[in-house]
Amino acid sequence: MNLPSALLALLLAAPVCGVDADDRVDLTSPIERNLPPERNAYIIWREVVPKFHSPEDENVAKALHDFTRFTESIPLDEVRQKLAAWLDSMEPNLDRLYEGLALGACEFPESNLSVYAFSFPAFRRAWEAQLLRARFQSEKGLYAQAVETLAKGLRFADLNSSAGGDIIHWYIGVASRNHLQRGVRWIAMQDSASGAIPALLAALSGLFDDAAVRRSVAAEWTNYVLPDLNDVISGLATNQLFQGADGARLLNRAACTNLLVEMGEAVIENTRLTWAKQEPFLPDTIRTLCPMQDVDKIRDITRDASLNEKWFWNADTVTKVINLGQARENGVGLILVAIYAPERESTPRLYFSGRTETSLTRAYLLLRAHQLRAKEWPAQLSDALPANPPPDVVLDYFSNQPLRYSRERRLLWSVGPDGT
């Protein structure tokens, strides 16, 4: 078989001094670890390519997989150009090729060859087949690496084309089963001008129309990347959800809004379980506060005042609870609940217990800023409350709507846009 001249140029671009005409590599044994990467890559490629015309050779995929790990030394642009040309010449044996590439992509996600290969539908099918094998199902970290690689591979597809849409929806369908958030996190932190953000979020909004999927993904996100949820939320918010016309359309999608709702509830549940280990009375308190769906339920809440004081004044600060239960299609009607002791503190204050909850608050701030078309907003939600609120009415800094509170129940809640 004759190799395309472009492929030969690719392979010979790196120095391969010392490679003799009679050199052979045993495809049934591991690669020579003491050889320079360029030499190993050259030897393997020279041995593998002719064997694509011998389907009975089951070592082809393994050898190509070994070659994949060495392609980081080859410029990505060259990989893109010359891999595509080579694929055209290998049509009869692509299944074997893709199998090897998929195996390599799972184990070496940073390989340039792995990253670009995701642009090819047949490769994506082979990659999914590899993931379904037992060895990959039992290695969740490896799965997450492969998903992240796919996210990077999306950079090299035209996401505005029908093929690009197929890539996005295929990615969502496969990756949402496990570790979706890792790929989304990577994409969320990229420049929104890349085109990946709008296309991915558009697909996500459709995916999240399914409430069960929403809950599952929200739980996965909050459990798997709890310390990094701030990056996920902030990245999605600043890159796409809250910018420009496309952002406005996505923002108005109930499914996108509901995702924040599900994530907020997952965080609250996680926090409740953490607090439950510390003080036995906290679960009942949180359980009473968190499922609030309307103001009437808030008004009906009655708790022992001493418990509330013990709960919040045991710590250095008071506590806040964010309820995300009132999603509206045109945004989020967010109820903020602050329980405080007036005799100890004249101003209701909000307590941030870690980066995760702060990130949800930041997402809310960005949401409100977008809705009200304001240019600047406070970095901390506590800054939004007046230093000396009136005794009976506090104004919501974001919407200039009055906040009602009950001195007896020590509750502060916001009034929605419709006055409820």
Give a label for each model feature.
Residues 17-420:
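Short acidic linear motifs
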Residues 5-15:
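Bacterial N-terminal signal peptides
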